[in-house]
Amino acid sequence: MEFKEKLLASHLAFEGSIDFSDSVHQTRLESLKTFEQKGFPSRKDEAWKYTSLNSMLRNDFALFPETETTIEIKKVKKYFLYEIDTYKVVFIDGVYSPFLSDTTHDGLDVCLISAALSKSKYRRFIDTYFNKIADTKDSLTSLNTSFTKEGAYIYIPKSVVAEKPIELIHFSTGKEKSLWLQPRNLIVVDKNAQVQILERHQSLKPHQVVTNSVTEIFAHQDSFLDYYKIQNDFSTASLIDNTSVSYTHLTLPTKRIV
């Protein structure tokens, strides 16, 4: 079975295993249809004319880890921001690790996107922001949307300054010979709010891992967001990253110099 067919075949069971709102279900099904029609990009696509995915797609990727993997904190502590207290959302082989994470709802939201997609109190934010600036015509973005489950949801309310930086960390352990990951992040920084975010992709040993990541960032008027991405993987790892940003830019009348 080709990898595309494996993805399509596994989606029905995956969709039935989660409890999201009807609108999210519909978005996911529409995105799956887009991926089914377009398939994986090839060199015929302008953005991929210098890159072929053919050899990578021959791997028999695991889509869902069979068991949850645990990691001793002493083995990965060096990958956290040194001597700085931070909020953390940590994933191990695509699965959320509550032991390594430090989330919050105290004045701001740093939590899982699965919680935001499934709980009614977040419905207004999801309807306003989820999948609104991601490229819905892109096949890999659509694939990510159709399988959205794990990832971070961050909301910094109006005029709030996050007291601590936020770390989003994805560890791949090598427990699976070949692994396909699809994290989805939704970040909203409201008017006059401030936050620093660091996203890290870290493989712990050489193995075939592909991360098809999608992040949507909304930075409202007079907000400040410092966002850093670190990919510290072995050469056997691949990161496909689609980050979309919506922000406010004002150009006021000025005197021309020339």
Protein language model regions, located:
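Generic hydrophobic alpha-helical segments
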Residues: 42, 224, 255-256
